[in-house]
């Protein structure tokens, strides 16, 4: 039985449906609730069961205060409220508060895109070269962050893809031939890719 689109409440046929948020939608009914931009399944945010584009709409409506209020990538900050009448002359500040302000320093604005560490903490260290791995150049595999060129087979040096390789003692290996030669069952891939070597029995017959 065909399901009903949660946007227009009409029947959704197989040829025109997309599935998102656990429901079937007409392809052109899956739109941002705020700006009506057509969305792709799995490529949008959700609030109260309704779809929103990530930027700027979801960030504007439900993100941290001050982030993306003006649009994608923009930052708006509130001006501090004046407390009491303004004084033009010098003001005495208690020593304790002066030290506290000195320690905290002036408020910082948003960092550049390259310095994602402001929000995520210090970057991890690549297990291959022991240098810092920044967001734009990292791949994650074996529970660690690597530079893209540093994730290569420990034996032959071939560049690997995250999740597409074998592992031994925390080191990455290509499945064939290296892992098979070094750690596979005896006789498998000992010669080259796809080759099999068999031991002979005492009578000289080949053992399968």
Swiss-Prot record:
Gene3D superfamilies: Cysteine Rich Protein. Signal peptide: none annotated. PANTHER family: CYSTEINE-RICH PROTEIN 2, CYSTEINE-RICH PROTEIN CRIP FAMILY MEMBER. The keyword Repeat applies. Interacts with TGFB1I1. SUPFAM superfamilies: Glucocorticoid receptor-like (DNA-binding domain). Residues 5-57, 126-178 form the LIM zinc-binding domain. SMART domains: LIM (SM00132). The modification Phosphoserine is found at residue 104. This is Cysteine-rich protein 2. Residues 98-119 are annotated as: Disordered. The gene is CRIP2. One of its GO terms (molecular function) is metal ion binding. It holds the Pfam family LIM. The modification N6-acetyllysine is found at residues 23, 138, 144. InterPro entries: Znf_LIM. Keywords: Acetylation, LIM domain, Metal-binding, Phosphoprotein, Repeat, Zinc.
């Amino acid at each position: 039985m065909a399901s009903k689109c949660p946007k227009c409440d009409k029947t959704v046929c197989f040829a025109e449906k997309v599935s998102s948020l656990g429901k079937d939608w007409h392809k052109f009914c899956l739109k941002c609730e705020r700006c009506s931009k057509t969305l792709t399944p799995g490529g949008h945010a959700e609030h109260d069961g309704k779809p929103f584009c990530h930027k700027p709409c979801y960030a504007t409506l439900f993100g941290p205060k001050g982030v993306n209020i003006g649009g994608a990538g923009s930052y708006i900050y509130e001006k501090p409220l004046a407390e009491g009448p303004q004084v033009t002359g010098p003001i005495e500040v208690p020593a304790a508060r002066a030290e506290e302000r000195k320690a905290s320093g002036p408020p910082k604005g948003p960092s550049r895109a390259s310095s994602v560490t402001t929000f995520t903490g210090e970057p991890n260290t690549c297990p291959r070269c022991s240098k810092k791995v920044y967001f734009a150049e990292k791949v994650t595999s074996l529970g660690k962050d690597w530079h893209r060129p540093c994730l290569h087979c420990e034996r032959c040096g071939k560049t690997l893809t995250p999740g597409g390789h074998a592992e031994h003692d925390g080191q990455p290996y290509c499945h064939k031939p290296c892992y098979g030669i070094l750690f596979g069952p005896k006789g498998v891939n000992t010669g080259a890719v796809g080759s099999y070597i068999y031991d002979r029995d005492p009578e000289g017959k080949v053992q399968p």
